[in-house]
């Protein structure tokens, strides 16, 4: 597994690199924190571990840049005790979030879970669903409508799959939150709202933002 570890604390970087390599992970770091994307594109990581507080530009900036060109899983690290960091990471399409200090074995377990979810599942037979006049590719986390294609984060795709497998039915927020927790994603009532709003924003790019309806006090419904 190729891991890009974007961490400016060299002591922590070396400790994590040593631990991860004991699990046969191939770990690369950053030499110039103004050129993170250069390393990202040349190393082609399978998972990115991204610190929030970085020199020159913060982790949120680099997450945006990565999401412009890739749907690679991103796990944020943060030493700040600020719930908005977690919300922001969700809005930007991160797959997980850990607050420092943390147990290394928990980090490794999260990385393994992300890898299984993203790469082992997508290696299976292609799974698609038809929704309105679009094709939802569950293996690629994408939606194609005509000549246009959008890409979703893992959390967004889980939400969408739940809704479109129960088309024209109200799915409660609690049902979705439970499914996300079972999938080891990080989620709360507020971050669910953030994810649904971000999902709608992406759907608007293919003129499908009204395809998911909010049922106030009840949940959400995907229309046929």
Swiss-Prot record:
Interacts with GraX. It comes from the Bacteria. It is found in: Cytoplasm. Gene3D superfamilies: 3.40.50.2300, Winged helix-like DNA-binding domain superfamily/Winged helix DNA-binding domain. InterPro entries: CheY-like_superfamily, OmpR/PhoB-type_DNA-bd, Sig_transdc_resp-reg_C-effctor, Sig_transdc_resp-reg_receiver, WalR-like, WH-like_DNA-bd_sf. This is Response regulator protein GraR. Residues 126-224 bind DNA. The keyword Zinc does not apply. The lineage of its organism: Bacteria, Bacillati, Bacillota, Bacilli, Bacillales. Keywords: Activator, Antibiotic resistance, Cytoplasm, DNA-binding, Phosphoprotein, Repressor, Transcription, Transcription regulation, Two-component regulatory system, Virulence. Phosphorylated by GraS. Phosphorylated by Stk1; phosphorylation increases the DNA-binding activity of GraR. The modification 4-aspartylphosphate is found at residue 51. GO terms for molecular function: phosphorelay response regulator activity; transcription cis-regulatory region binding. Disruption phenotype: Deletion leads to complete loss of resistance towards host cationic antimicrobial peptides (CAPs). Residues 2-115 form the Response regulatory domain. Disulfide bonds: none annotated. The modification Phosphothreonine is found at residues 128, 130, 149. SMART domains: REC, Trans_reg_C. Member of the two-component regulatory system GraR/GraS involved in resistance against cationic antimicrobial peptides (CAMPs). Upon phosphorylation by GraS, functions as a transcription regulator by direct binding to promoter regions of target genes such as adhesins, exoproteins, transporters, toxins, and proteins involved in cell wall synthesis. Down-regulates the expression of many genes involved in RNA and amino acid synthesis or glycolysis.
């Amino acid at each position: 597994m190729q891991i890009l570890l974007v961490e400016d604390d060299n002591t922590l970087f070396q400790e994590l690199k040593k631990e991860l390599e004991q699990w046969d992970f191939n770990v690369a770091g950053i030499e110039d924190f103004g050129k993170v994307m250069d390393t990202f594109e040349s190393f082609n990581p399978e998972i990115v571990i991204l610190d929030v507080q970085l020199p020159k530009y913060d982790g949120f900036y680099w997450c945006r840049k990565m999401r412009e060109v890739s749907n690679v899983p991103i796990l944020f690290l943060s030493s700040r005790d600020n719930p908005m960091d977690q919300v922001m990471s969700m809005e930007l399409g991160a797959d997980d979030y850990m607050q420092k200090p943390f147990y290394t074995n928990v980090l490794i377990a999260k990385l393994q879970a992300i890898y299984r979810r993203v790469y082992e599942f997508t290696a299976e037979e292609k799974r698609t669903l038809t929704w309105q006049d679009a094709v939802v590719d569950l293996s690629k986390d994408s939606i194609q409508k005509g000549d246009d294609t959008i890409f979703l984060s893992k959390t967004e795709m889980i939400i969408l799959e739940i809704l479109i497998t129960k088309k024209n039915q109200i799915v409660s927020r609690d049902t979705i939150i439970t499914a996300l927790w079972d999938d080891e994603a990080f989620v709360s009532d507020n971050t669910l709202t953030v994810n649904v709003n971000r999902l709608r924003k992406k759907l608007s790019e293919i003129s499908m933002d009204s395809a998911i309806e909010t049922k106030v006090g009840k949940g959400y419904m995907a229309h046929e």
